[in-house]
């Protein structure tokens, strides 16, 4: 089996650092959030441990031409900017545009989880969905809410695949792979004044 080389890079936004994994074309395969660079590196190694036969990871600086990867990283940083930096730019915010400009590829997850992640891509900035909404959109039985929740928790492409926009029917913020405090901060940034109406703390 041919082993594909992917490149990792650490970037720093206004509320967190992010570990990104991309290919030479700028396609994003992985994005993890955190405050500690060493912890992000350790998580990267752990998350890719089961993928060693398919992928090898190298630092981005080893890529001779990383112009496309740099562009993707720049677009990702737009997703990490404070609200006032992006909320007013015509019909679409910089945040929304940034997400649309980032090509992604799923290499983790089950078939169902990938279907859930694909559905999450349909949630616009400034809106939230309940787990039940995702179940209904995918035509799954109502009992699948837990599976949808697990899929959100298994997402390994932070922000671009917006699992942070899925909340409980009560409006309560439930688990988030990168911490509830981070989920809260992102939603406050995206929802603005609507946060207190849509989210119950």
Curated annotation (Swiss-Prot):
The active site is at residue 163. It catalyses: a 6-O-methyl-2'-deoxyguanosine in DNA + L-cysteinyl-[protein] = S-methyl-L-cysteinyl-[protein] + a 2'-deoxyguanosine in DNA; a 4-O-methyl-thymidine in DNA + L-cysteinyl-[protein] = a thymidine in DNA + S-methyl-L-cysteinyl-[protein]. It is found in: Nucleus. The keyword Transport does not apply. It is an enzyme of class 2 (transferase). One of its GO terms (biological process) is methylation. Keywords: DNA damage, DNA repair, DNA-binding, Methyltransferase, Nucleus, Transferase. Its EC number is 2.1.1.63. It holds the Pfam family DNA_binding_1. One of its GO terms (cellular component) is nucleus. One of its GO terms (molecular function) is DNA binding. Its main location: nucleus. DNA binds at residues 131-132, 146. The keyword Secreted does not apply. NCBIfam families: ogt. This enzyme catalyzes only one turnover and therefore is not strictly catalytic. According to one definition, an enzyme is a biocatalyst that acts repeatedly and over many reaction cycles. Belongs to the MGMT family. This is Methylated-DNA--protein-cysteine methyltransferase. It comes from Lodderomyces elongisporus (strain ATCC 11503 / CBS 2605 / JCM 1781 / NBRC 1676 / NRRL YB-4239) (Yeast). The gene is MGT1.
